[in-house]
């Protein structure tokens, strides 16, 4: 869960961190669909809604705070959810992997996600309109460079590979060893990734601020 505040001082405050942990525990137990539903739910181990608990936390710490987002994964049978959190707690990522025995590889992939910021898990997940737009951009670029249309189309194919490498996890070069892609890394270890999520303070909503990624 991503619980945001305004200053570093509050982000390390025990009261704020306790509330952030409560949000994480509640999301795990109650499986809300979105933040609005989450805030209206009664805390799984109490009698107050998360909205009331947030207001009480704000009153205690004296600083605006909010639950900015969350992701909830259920590990596949025999698998696990691996989490990487940057030391400053402002960037975090999580992935669901198919083999709990390969947790180290899952952690490495989560760290990769936090740094390389893939938008999609596989090439098939990229929306058709996004692909079509990029193809047109690259075709126009190739033609402007003076390439004949039949050559330009081949150039576009090559450039689309680079495009996918930037935004698709499976296509990206592994952060710790760029001689292989994430897809190759997973194949070598005999595991799959079914879900991923990344949170970064100042990137996931309109308001910049400090925060606690739990």
Q: Language-model segments: what does each one mean?
A:
Residues 1-214:
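N-terminal assembly/interaction segments in proteins that build large macromolecular machines
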């Amino acid at each position: 869960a991503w619980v945001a505040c305004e200053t570093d001082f509050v982000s390390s405050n025990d009261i704020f961190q306790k509330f952030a942990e409560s949000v994480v525990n509640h999301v795990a137990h109650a499986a809300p669909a979105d933040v609005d539903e989450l805030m209206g739910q009664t805390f799984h181990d109490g009698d107050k809604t998360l909205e009331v608990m947030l207001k009480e936390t704000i009153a205690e710490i004296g600083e605006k705070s909010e639950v900015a987002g969350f992701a909830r994964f259920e590990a596949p049978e025999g698998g696990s959810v691996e989490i990487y959190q940057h030391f400053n707690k402002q960037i975090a990522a999580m992935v669901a992997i198919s083999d709990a025995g390969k947790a180290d590889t899952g952690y490495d992939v989560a760290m990769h996600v936090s740094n390389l910021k893939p938008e999609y898990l596989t090439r098939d997940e990229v929306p058709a309109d996004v692909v079509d737009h990029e193809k047109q951009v690259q075709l126009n670029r190739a033609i402007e460079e003076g390439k004949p249309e039949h050559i330009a189309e081949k150039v576009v194919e090559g450039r689309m590979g680079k495009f996918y490498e930037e935004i698709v996890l499976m296509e990206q070069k592994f952060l710790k060893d760029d001689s292989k892609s994430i897809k190759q890394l997973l194949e070598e270890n005999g595991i799959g990734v079914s879900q991923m999520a990344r949170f970064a303070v100042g990137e996931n909503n309109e308001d910049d601020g400090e925060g606690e990624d739990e």
